Amino acid sequence: MSGLSHLESEGCRNLLGMLDNDEIMALCDTVTNRLVQPVDRQDAIRAILVYSQNVEELLRRKKVHREVIFKYLATQGVVVPPTTEKHGLIQYAKSYWEEQSPKLKETAEPVKKTEDIQLFEQQAKEDKEAEKVDFRRLGEEFCHWFFELLNSQNPFLGPPQDEWGPQHFWHDVKLRFYYNTSEQNMTDYEGAEMVSLRLLSLVKEEFLFLSPNLDSQGLKCASSPHGLVMVGVAGTVHRGNSCLGIFEQIFGLIRSPFVENTWKIKFINLRIVGGSSLAPGSSLKPSVTFEQSDFEAFYNVITLCNTPEVRPNVRQILDSGTGDQVLCSGDEALLNKKEMNLPTPLKH
């Protein structure tokens, strides 16, 4: 549910009404991670209000321009210095909405208005429909959002479309990065800040462009009864006009319990293989090598490895090998299978 109060929602609704249709639809995509498809402008505004965690988060969005907030305050009779920066205007707006609230809080629950009842019924209907998640579509929408956002941080492609950062990950997210290019290596990263910065460096400092292959071979999805959704995607790696190789990436997504229909990244396995390291005769069209049953088994591996009883064995194994090796002793066959799928590295 929305983290905005009733007055904040009404104020932001009027403020958003000053944006044009393209800006509203783009803002809706950003706020909902492209997982909500509005049917019209009003539906998009409603989604923006419902899925925003708080009013500051919404007003700080790049697509909510400083001039729009200033114009809204002027229409409400709030006079502010024209040179006030955006963060100052946000505070003016918050103060204005707070002043509109009754000085004494009502002790009795107010009678719900007709539109409030309709909104509640609509939300309940959406919640019921959300239980039947199309994971294939969710995977496609997620990949479109993730790779567009990540690739837009490449300085050769102009200004970023939106802010990249740790807010898209769970705080204890884990990244396992395996690459086989001029050399072969595997590194683990942990924590939202560290994982976010490592992925960002691929496009911002190494100038890579990851192009996902979202057909039936390049994208596979699976879910667990605990709410973990796994998305596997393969694609090609580019720099400028050169295709450098292929990649395979597995995401573990968990729905946020605090923001409706919002998913955050719990773990990532990323494997990049340079074109010079591909086995002779390999097809350049990338495809996910895991089957649906492998996804489910891989989820079980991750779950087991987070238990205290298994973690010491995991560390021992990670310290002794390279590539996507065994995570837990009981699932050697599965992850050894993936290790076998890696192309034989070139000898130098």
UniProtKB/Swiss-Prot annotation:
GO cellular component terms, A-Z: nucleus
BP-aspect Gene Ontology terms: apoptotic process; positive regulation of apoptotic process
Pfam families listed in its UniProt record: DUF4518
CDD domains: NTF2_like (cd00531)
InterPro entries on file: NTF2-like_dom_sf, UPF_C3orf38
Record function comment: May be involved in apoptosis regulation.
Keyword check for Disulfide bond: no
Keywords: Apoptosis
Organism the protein comes from: Rattus norvegicus (Rat)
Keyword Glycoprotein set for record: no
Protein name, as recorded: Uncharacterized protein C3orf38 homolog
